[in-house]
């Protein structure tokens, strides 16, 4: 999963990929650590989605830009025209995450 450290980097990543999932996380966050292997597995299965992650401790400005207040927070941008994305906060099971991503 690509590590994003700046807003410019995230914007470029979104320009390069039509369907993007962003994982806002922190290394000290227990639920965030539970989400990582789940997302890594989904990345292998759902190849139409480009996965990236933002460490909120290292890229606080990116988190602030998107109004991230809780972690883990996942933002899904299913197309390039979607500027706000849809948000999933907290840990969810794989079936619920797949349903969220495909709905």
Residue ranges of model-derived segments:
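A short beta-strand-turn-helix
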Residues: 2-20, 60
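Thiol-based oxidoreductase modules, predominantly thioredoxin-like and allied folds used
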Residues: 4-6, 24, 36-61
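CheY-like receiver
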Residues: 12-13, 62-65, 100
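Short pre-active-site segment immediately N-terminal to redox-active cysteine/selenocysteine motifs
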Residues: 18, 25-28, 70
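Structural cue for short, hydrophobic secondary-structure segments
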Residues: 23-25, 76
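Short, thiol/selenol-centered motifs that function as redox-active sites or metal-ligating centers
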Residues: 28-35
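Structural micro-motif
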Residues: 60, 66-77
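Non-catalytic, surface beta->alpha helical segment in thiol-disulfide oxidoreductase systems
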Residues: 76-103
């Amino acid at each position: 999963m690509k590590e994003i450290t700046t807003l410019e980097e995230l914007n470029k990543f979104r320009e390069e990929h039509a369907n993007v999932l962003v994982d806002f996380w922190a290394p000290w966050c227990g639920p965030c650590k539970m989400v990582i292997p789940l997302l890594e597995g989904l990345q292998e299965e759902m190849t139409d989605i480009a996965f990236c992650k933002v460490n909120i401790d290292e890229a606080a400005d990116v988190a602030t830009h998107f109004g991230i207040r809780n972690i883990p927070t996942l933002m899904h941008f299913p197309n390039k025209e979607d500027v706000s994305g849809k948000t999933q906060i907290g840990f969810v099971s794989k079936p619920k995450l797949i349903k969220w991503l495909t709905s």
